[in-house]
């Protein structure tokens, strides 16, 4: 019996141990399953090109498993595809730190650094990747592209040679090697490589386009046209071949066909500055002056620092009899390039027509002096272009052309006048109905127990703190306002401020801003130590200013134009200031120094007042209180771009994108390469 008891005790211990191990393994398997699940979902989003959702999913994975280097790697790829190059570089770096033999991470970080123009570090990463896995072909290809961009043509050829040893059926390798030979002025080998690329893949339009461009360069226009036709046959949306074929048509005196192809390019890419420029020239040649002027106006909008736009438009204005406008354009061309002798001569002739004899004489003397300098320095290509009076500036430009003052980039991706990047709006207490969007967003917000207690004390189920004003229909807002107005009459003294607070919110939501500010003021008199009342009065005061200024058609906001150093501007003569609203937020901060939203709101108003360094400090304080404050990262990033610290600004905006701000990736597309 005793032996049986001992046996049963031992068995119970063994059973308990087995059960514990089973539970432990089950927990580990569950955790592993979850990690694998998020990893799989992240990859699935990436395969569907939904990179923002991929980042959100991978963020969850990395919160639970900080050592998941593959998660950082995948998130880096997602950021790369959203043009968040700095963010991608940071994630690839973490992946490498956690796994120093992660060859693919070295390769992708190198590609990212190459796009950032950081060629030395990119080449170092490629070297690491190749040393780790010399049998992998892709690093050779990518390093070859980087060396090509860095104008190391012979070294690039060597890399493409190594890639082709492993992968003989990749047409792009032959195209790139051919381009290298072309830069080395070895057109025979360039043709050989382009021909091989075509034989390797007869459906690849890039091969025909490259060979056609070389034919065109050698004035073999029939052969060039045939290649561009074939490229378009392979891909009817291949922009480069339409563009190049338009050049061929123009060279062979077929302006109608040239215009048709340029129209097609613009239907595929409506922001291509160089295409508008070329179409303006062709339209001028056929006498379609008014539409040519429209095209020049677009180019001046997209590339405002381009000297030839103003010079050619001045000539066009002269044809149209707009002499004063022509003079203004010649003047602009001279401002952009003071050695432009032809512009002085053109302006001199027009000033003579306007009977400005002294101005005409002065321009002629300056032009003569520039021409004399040119003739004494014929070896200087700058003088040979702009001081040569025999040179014409009405030839079509290729995609590789560069013009003084700015370069026409390939398929320029400039923004329209209305597409401006603004600060994300203020936070305030408002009425919002629960919906899935608000709930999803709210989970990432700053938690303040004091604010939660305040909401609970008010006791209104619609009360939320948000940067969205409301999602309630206008008719419902009017009914809510009527209810709260009646409630204020019945409120007891100890709860009067609550009724007044709710009434003020409803008044601001129906745009009765003056009434709302007055109501908040009365509420503050009843409860002067409540920071949230000051926060809302500040938000309402700021919103009232914006509303008034919008009526004057002069929004006070930060906008980033072509020049990243653009200033805060207000096009109207009236001035609006946010001093009272800023004072309210300062009071709120004194009453509750740990409230991140108050610093964020004050930073916004300081920025709109042109006080950028102070705004930067307040955004920084908000981020210290809430490191995952996405809007604060985004707005601080914009401020840093305005203060010409583009790299740090992009890092902040990258973080904002990682935290779910979709607008971040639009900004990064513009500034990723700066």
Language-model segments: which ranges?
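Helix-start (N-cap) detector for alpha-helical repeat units in TPR-like alpha-solenoids
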Residues: 34-36, 69-70, 103-104, 137-138, ...
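Canonical tetratricopeptide repeat
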Residues: 40, 74, 108, 142, ...
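Register position in tetratricopeptide repeats
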Residues: 47-48, 81, 115, 149-150, ...
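Structural marker of alpha-solenoid helical repeat scaffolds
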Residues: 64, 98, 132, 166-167, ...
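Eukaryotic alpha-helical solenoid repeat scaffolds
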Residues: 319, 339-500, 505-507, 548-577, ...
């Amino acid at each position: 019996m005793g032996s049986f008891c001992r046996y049963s005790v031992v068995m119970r211990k063994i059973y308990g141990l087995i059960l514990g191990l089973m539970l432990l393994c089950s927990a580990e398997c569950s955790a592993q399953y979850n990690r694998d699940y998020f990893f799989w979902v992240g990859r699935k989003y990436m395969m569907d090109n939904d990179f923002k959702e991929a980042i959100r999913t991978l963020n969850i994975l990395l919160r639970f498993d900080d050592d998941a280097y593959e998660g950082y790697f995948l998130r880096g790829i997602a950021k790369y595809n959203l043009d968040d190059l700095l963010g991608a570089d940071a994630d690839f770096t973490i992946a490498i730190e956690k796994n120093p033999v992660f060859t693919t991470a070295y390769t992708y970080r190198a590609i990212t650094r190459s796009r950032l123009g950081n060629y030395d570090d990119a080449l170092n990463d490629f070297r690491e990747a190749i040393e780790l896995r010399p049998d992998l072909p892709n690093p050779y290809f990518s390093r070859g592209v980087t060396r090509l961009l860095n104008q190391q043509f012979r070294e690039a050829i060597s890399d493409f040679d190594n890639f082709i040893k492993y992968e003989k059926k990749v047409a792009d390798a032959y195209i790139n090697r051919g381009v290298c030979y072309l830069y080395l002025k070895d057109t025979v080998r360039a043709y050989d490589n382009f021909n091989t690329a075509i034989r390797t893949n007869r459906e690849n339009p890039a091969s025909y386009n490259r060979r056609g461009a070389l034919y065109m360069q050698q004035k073999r226009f029939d052969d060039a046209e045939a290649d561009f036709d074939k490229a378009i046959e392979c891909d009817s949306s291949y922009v480069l071949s339409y563009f190049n074929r338009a050049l061929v048509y123009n060279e062979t005196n077929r302006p109608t066909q040239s215009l048709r192809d340029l129209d097609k390019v613009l239907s595929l890419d409506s922001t291509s500055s160089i295409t508008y420029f070329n179409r303006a020239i062709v339209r001028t040649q056929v006498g379609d002056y008014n539409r040519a002027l429209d095209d020049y106006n677009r180019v001046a909008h997209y590339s405002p620092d381009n000297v030839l736009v103003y010079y050619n438009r001045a000539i066009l204005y002269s044809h149209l009899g707009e002499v004063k406008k022509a003079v203004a354009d010649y003047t602009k061309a001279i401002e952009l390039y003071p050695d432009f002798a032809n512009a002085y001569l053109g302006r001199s002739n027009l000033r003579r027509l306007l009977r400005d004899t002294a101005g005409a004489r002065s321009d002629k003397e300056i032009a003569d002096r520039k021409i004399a300098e040119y003739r004494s320095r014929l070896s200087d290509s700058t003088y040979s272009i702009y001081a040569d009076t025999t040179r014409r500036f009405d030839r079509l430009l290729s995609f590789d052309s560069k013009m003084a003052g700015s370069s026409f980039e390939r398929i320029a991706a400039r923004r329209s006048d209305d597409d401006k990047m603004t600060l994300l709006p203020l936070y305030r207490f408002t009425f919002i109905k629960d919906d899935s969007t608000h709930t999803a967003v709210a989970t990432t917000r700053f938690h303040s127990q004091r604010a939660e207690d305040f909401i609970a004390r008010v006791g209104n189920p619609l009360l939320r703190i948000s940067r969205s004003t409301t999602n309630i229909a206008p008719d419902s807002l009017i009914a809510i306002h009527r209810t709260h107005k009646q409630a204020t009459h019945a409120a007891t003294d100890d709860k009067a401020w609550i009724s007044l607070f709710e009434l003020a919110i409803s008044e601001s939501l129906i745009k009765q801003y003056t009434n709302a500010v007055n109501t908040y003021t009365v509420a503050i008199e009843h409860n002067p130590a409540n920071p949230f009342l000051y926060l809302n009065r500040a938000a309402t005061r700021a919103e009232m200013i914006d509303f008034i200024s919008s009526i004057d058609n002069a929004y006070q906001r930060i906008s980033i134009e072509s020049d990243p150093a653009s200033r805060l501007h207000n096009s109207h003569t009236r001035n609006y200031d946010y001093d009272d609203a800023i004072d309210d937020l300062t009071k709120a901060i004194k009453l509750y120094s740990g409230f991140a939203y108050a610093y964020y709101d004050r930073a916004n108003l300081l920025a709109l007042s042109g006080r950028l360094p102070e705004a930067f400090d307040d955004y920084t304080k908000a981020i210290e209180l809430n490191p995952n404050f996405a809007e604060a990262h985004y707005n601080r990033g914009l401020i840093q771009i305005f203060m010409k610290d583009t790299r740090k600004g992009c890092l902040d905006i990258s973080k904002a994108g990682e935290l779910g701000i979709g607008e971040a990736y639009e900004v990064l597309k513009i500034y990723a390469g700066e």
